[in-house]
Amino acid sequence: MKDCEERQRAAAPSRILVMCIREALKGQCAEIKRRADKAASIGREDNMNFESARANMVDNQLRTTDVTSHSVLTAFLTVPREAFVPEKAKPLAYIDRDVEICPAAAGKPARYLMQPSPLAKLLQLAAVTKDDVVLEIGAGSGYVSALFSQIAGTVVAVEEDETLAAEAKANLANYTNVSVVTGSLNAGNPSGAPYDLIFISGSVEEVPSSLLSQLRDGGRLVTVQGYGGSARAKVFVSERGTISENVYFNASVKPLPGFAKAREFVF
């Protein structure tokens, strides 16, 4: 009996040590779980913030500038704008301003994701239907084509910058009705013509005939022509071989490279 009591006393520290280890492990597990839950919560909060920002963009930037098209508003609510900007620019994705997606380099100008409010007005002006075949000029990172994918039948996006074209292809991988073509912006994509709509994602000094010739009879080209305060949103319509031009509203939009008017020399 005495031996048994001595063995129990000798074993007591070991049992206490085991219990301490168990409690410590429980504490570590609880801390790990707490941190994991917090990380997941932060992720959910980030998603909720983007969703909330998207809704605020529609309510406070688009509706307030007379964008009333249900299909256009739904497209802006559906497509995550933050997925089409660089990581460091994601907090700026839903501010009503242009967002730089490619810095200027080697003589090439910077490229931008268009400010939401003029972009939405231009898409509304385009009056896209589910049967339309759309050609976007200047795909950039793919955001505008993603919007068109929600309201058009087929979308072809042309981008001449190889880095941006690769980025657009990756961003649009799950948009099954969109294809990205790498090539000259002002050449368009004649192999896929004619198009119901050609949309130029940036302002231009002049619209080349090479693009207008790719319109279907009754098709239209939507763009912003001119720079700064003199820029106007325009729709060019092809009817029986004749192009008509209509001016709609002022729009300040970043220029797209390759559409400068040829300069005339005066002697």
Give residue spans per PLM region.
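Generic structural signal for secondary-structure transition and capping sites
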Residues: 6, 81-84, 177, 220, ...
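Basic polycationic patches enriched in arginine
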Residues: 7-9, 15, 22, 34-35, ...
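SAM/dcSAM-binding transferase cores
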Residues: 29-32, 43-54, 195, 213, ...
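Class I SAM-dependent transferase core
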Residues: 32, 42-133, 151, 164-166, ...
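Conserved nucleotide-cofactor-binding alpha/beta core module
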Residues: 123-244
